[in-house]
């Protein structure tokens, strides 16, 4: 086994690293150890190897470990005058000092230097100063009441070299990481603080792993479970000056991981804004609607949620006992009989507010659908109890329907036994669900998902997981945290509704109250306060703020046939033309107010979609779908037309509308076009909704209902599903000619399972064989360009062909690709100068937007050139002016 070979090599490695060993750091019986710092430490709690080794070495010490680390943290947030910008947490979360006291830390293990290293040589002196202040401040803290805290510094690990073109290059990262590790060693020595040089250790480990064909990180900078397992014994030796314990430690590690899971649920609790932040102060009558006066006893969110936090603390402590017992060679069963009680309250809605739920079939009788359309029930909770509170849906390359089910909404209680799930429905010929498989169980607030290669990305803040079924049983048996640091301050606003762009980038968002910071291999942490949409390249791990804006809750993201996106802020159901305000603007700044592209009749909106299906009439194609759950409870249908550089919307006949008096629980939450061209949508199926209108633990919050419906158009044939799964590259490329947007997306997902070099070679051949007289030639060629983008392979010749297309839609789409290839094509500003002078304002808009990503005043000149094509440069197109103003605001700092 490769891993076994690597671990054997690790024994040999120990002899070459003896110079790194500390004098022999000692832990005393009963001590509490707190880990602070960046994602390296954060991930350690989920792998558990180093902690397991320490318990195995000191089985009678009954040590307590609490992980307080978070991706993106920097030492500047931990000094005597902490800068909150470098330790972002939601409102009233508490300082590092607060948490060290709360966990009664006797010993602090601090992991810094990675995020700081992006400041390069210019930041070294500042880093050393802050590190010195941190040491002095921390050593002056008596967190446990037993004496001042003892400190150990751990350097960052090295970046792992790789020949994978989709990984960040290790060499430039290591040039800085080596300097910052040396700076840590220098400051640690001056402060007489034990220091563990993980940079040197990991560098040696990478070399040995490479000889066995193994990698220890999944993205150059973050360790896999195997990487953590390889690092742990060497870190142990460097810290304690002796060889790590051997033998089978699986049971001990399992106990450690269970304890860490419960602690993570406590420390990174969901809905922190309601647990200890601004909305924790909201109060409601204990007797609910039965309260007789305004002076009746009240109970706040804080009251109840602090009771739950106390339960989580006790649960974690109970699992400490199991760890100690197993470390001593015994066994122990978790005993949670000592959990403190949680206060309860009655609903603030009267009993007669809660009426019996009509069945899914009965509910259809009280729905009105668009003329010619027909609605049928696909699945409901009576048949499939797992289908509770569906929040996102999508069809995979096999034609199966996936649904994220969120019965715990707004979040799990400490004692819940039923967890949230990612479900997979097999459908019959009639389009109805015949079977359900739970792909992922044990989740807490799975607010979004997206298919990726042979697996699925799942949002479960603070993380995005990549989960796969490797043995073919339909259930996930492998998963990896691929993004860390999304805030979970409010589950209403947590990262959600993942959506693919046509070039393989995927988008996710979070809303107000959130303080997100995510680590990447490409620069400092991506940080944002309050609303933002983020752009992630799953293949490369590149991550950036896509639309930082004053959103409350941007739940809606949908792309049209040509890659134009419509963005929806759910709370106010404000809908925007995405290209206008998705240019670069440096954090913490946000884009200014943008006009809505459509005046919505009602709010709020939990999800959006787009009609792209020949099963529906021609005048339905490209219609924007907008779900609504209060007042109007149904799905709006919107005609989308060109409006200069942008788009505009016109309200049409509703797709579906519920009779609020008869089915008040009808709450359409998400939608998707099926492979046969029909439209599916989920019904959240709740009478009581809203975070702040009711206590977070109002007993009226339904945990069991959920429905899926299907809309077809009478008199029109359903589409024959295009076979995607398992098809060869050539057939998948032909599928890119299909008019349906979702079919083309699924074809590109399937293509991503194939070797990129082979896909791109076949794509070049396919593109060369396209008929230039085909009315859709421009779109087919654009799809070829998007396939290149999806596989992260630049083809300048193809790019230039599409940039010069006779179809302005294609030219605009290619300009967007040029923006993301700007660092890999020759003279990108020269290309953009031509686009900025294009006859069509959409192309000029994309050129202006692209200019915002440069760091030179020459880009501003190119952007300004777009005005020359305006009929009246003093009164330009609205979107041109908006985007130009934002671009110049960004570029104004460059001379």
Say what each PLM segment does.
Residues 1-10:
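Bacterial N-terminal signal peptides that target proteins for export
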Residues 21-71, 96-104, 108, 231:
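Serine-esterase "nucleophile elbow" of acetyl-processing enzymes
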Residues 28, 45, 59, 146, ...:
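Conserved catalytic region of serine esterases and O-acyltransferases that act on ester linkages
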Residues 32-36, 64-69, 107-112, 150-155, ...:
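Structural recognition of the beta-strand scaffold that forms the well-ordered cores
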Residues 36, 46-49, 77-80, 86-128, ...:
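Oxyanion-hole/transition-state-stabilizing segment in secreted/luminal serine hydrolases
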Residues 146, 335-732, 742, 750-752:
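Beta-propeller domains with acidic blade repeats across secreted/periplasmic ectodomains
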Residues 161-198:
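Substrate-gating cap/lid alpha-helix
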Residues 263, 278, 288-377, 589, ...:
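Extracellular/periplasmic ectodomains of large secreted or surface enzymes and adhesion receptors
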């Amino acid at each position: 086994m490769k891993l076994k070979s690597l671990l054997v090599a690790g024994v040999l490695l120990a002899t070459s690293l003896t110079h790194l060993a500390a004098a022999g750091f000692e832990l005393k019986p009963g001590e509490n150890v707190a880990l602070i710092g960046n994602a390296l430490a954060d991930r350690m709690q989920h792998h558990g190897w180093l902690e397991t080794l320490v318990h195995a070495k000191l089985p009678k010490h009954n040590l307590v470990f609490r992980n307080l680390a978070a991706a993106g943290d920097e030492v500047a947030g931990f000094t005597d005058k902490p800068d909150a910008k470098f330790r972002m947490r939601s409102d009233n979360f508490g300082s590092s000092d607060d948490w060290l006291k709360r966990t009664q830390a006797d010993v602090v293990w601090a992991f810094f230097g990675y995020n700081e290293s992006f400041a390069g040589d210019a930041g070294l002196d500042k880093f050393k100063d802050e590190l010195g202040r941190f040491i002095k401040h921390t050593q002056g803290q008596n967190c446990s009441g037993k004496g001042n805290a003892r400190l150990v510094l751990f350097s960052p690990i090295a970046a792992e070299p790789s020949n994978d073109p989709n990984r960040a290059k290790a060499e430039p990262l290591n040039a800085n990481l080596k300097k910052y590790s040396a700076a840590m060693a220098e400051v640690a020595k001056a402060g007489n603080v034990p220091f563990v040089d993980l940079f040197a250790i990991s560098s040696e480990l990478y070399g040995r792993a490479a000889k066995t064909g193994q990698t220890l990180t999944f993205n150059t900078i973050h360790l896999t479970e195997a990487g953590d397992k390889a690092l742990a014994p060497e870190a142990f030796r460097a810290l304690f000056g002796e060889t790590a314990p051997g033998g089978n430690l699986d049971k001990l590690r399992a106990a450690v991981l269970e304890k860490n899971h419960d602690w993570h649920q406590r420390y990174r609790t969901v809905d922190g804004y309601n647990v200890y932040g601004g909305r924790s102060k909201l109060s409601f009558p204990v007797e609910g609607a039965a309260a007789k006066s305004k002076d009746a006893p009240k109970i706040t969110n804080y009251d109840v949620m602090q009771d739950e936090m106390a339960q989580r603390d006790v649960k974690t402590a109970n699992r400490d006992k199991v760890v100690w017992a197993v470390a001593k060679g015994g066994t122990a069963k978790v005993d949670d009989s000592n959990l403190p009680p949680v206060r309860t309250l009655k609903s603030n809605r009267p009993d007669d507010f809660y009426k019996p739920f009509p069945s899914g079939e009965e509910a259809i009788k009280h729905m009105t659908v668009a003329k010619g359309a027909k609605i049928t029930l696909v699945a409901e909770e009576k048949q499939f109890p797992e289908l509770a509170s569906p929040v996102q849906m999508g069809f995979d390359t096999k034609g199966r329907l996936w649904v994220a089910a969120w019965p715990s909404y707004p979040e799990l209680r400490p004692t819940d036994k039923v967890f949230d799930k990612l479900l997979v429905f097999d459908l019959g010929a009639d389009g109805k669900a015949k079977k359900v498989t739970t792909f992922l169980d044990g989740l807490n607030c799975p607010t979004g998902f997206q298919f990726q290669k042979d697996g699925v990305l799942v949002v479960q803040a603070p993380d995005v997981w990549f989960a796969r079924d490797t043995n073919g049983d339909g259930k996930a048996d492998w998963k990896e945290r691929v993004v860390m640091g999304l805030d979970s301050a409010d589950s209403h606003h947590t990262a959600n509704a993942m959506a693919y762009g046509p070039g393989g980038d995927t988008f996710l968002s979070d809303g107000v109250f959130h303080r997100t910071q995510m680590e990447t291999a490409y620069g400092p942490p991506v940080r944002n306060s309050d609303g933002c949409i983020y752009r992630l390249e799953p293949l490369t791990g590149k991550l950036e703020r896509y639309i930082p804006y004053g959103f409350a809750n941007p739940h809606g993201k949908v792309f049209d046939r040509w890659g134009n996106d419509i963005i929806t802020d759910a709370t106010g159901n404000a809908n925007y033309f995405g290209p206008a305000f998705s240019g670069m603007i440096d954090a913490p700044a946000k884009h200014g107010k943008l006009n809505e592209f459509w005046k919505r009749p009602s709010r709020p909106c939990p999800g959006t979609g787009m009609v792209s299906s020949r099963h529906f009439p021609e005048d339905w194609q490209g219609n924007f779908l907008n779900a609504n759950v209060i007042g109007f409870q149904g799905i709006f249908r919107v005609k989308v037309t060109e409006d200069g550089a942008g788009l505009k919307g016109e309200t049409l006949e509703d797709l579906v509308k519920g009779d609020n008096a008869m089915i008040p629980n009808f709450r359409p939450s998400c939608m998707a076009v099926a492979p046969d061209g029909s439209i599916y949508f989920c019904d959240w199926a709740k009478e009581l909704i809203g975070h702040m209108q009711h206590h977070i633990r109002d007993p009226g919050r339904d945990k069991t209902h959920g429905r899926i419906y299907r809309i077809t158009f009478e008199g029109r044939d359903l589409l024959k599903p295009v076979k995607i799964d398992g098809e060869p590259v050539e057939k998948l490329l032909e599928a890119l000619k299909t008019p349906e947007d979702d079919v083309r997306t699924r074809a590109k997902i399937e293509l991503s399972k194939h070797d990129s070099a082979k896909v791109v070679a076949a794509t070049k051949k396919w593109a060369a064989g396209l008929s230039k007289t085909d009315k859709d030639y421009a779109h087919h060629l654009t799809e070829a360009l998007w396939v290149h983008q999806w596989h992260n392979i630049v083809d300048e010749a193809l790019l230039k062909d599409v940039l010069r297309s006779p179809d302005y839609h294609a030219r605009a789409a290619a300009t967007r690709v040029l923006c993301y290839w700007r660092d890999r094509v020759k003279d990108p500003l020269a290309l953009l100068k031509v686009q900025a002078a294009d006859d069509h304002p959409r192309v000029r808009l994309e050129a202006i937007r692209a200019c915002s990503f440069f760091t030179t005043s020459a880009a501003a000149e190119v952007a300004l050139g777009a005005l020359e094509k305006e009929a009246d440069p003093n009164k330009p197109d609205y979107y041109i002016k908006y985007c130009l103003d934002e671009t110049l605001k960004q570029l104004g700092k460059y001379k």
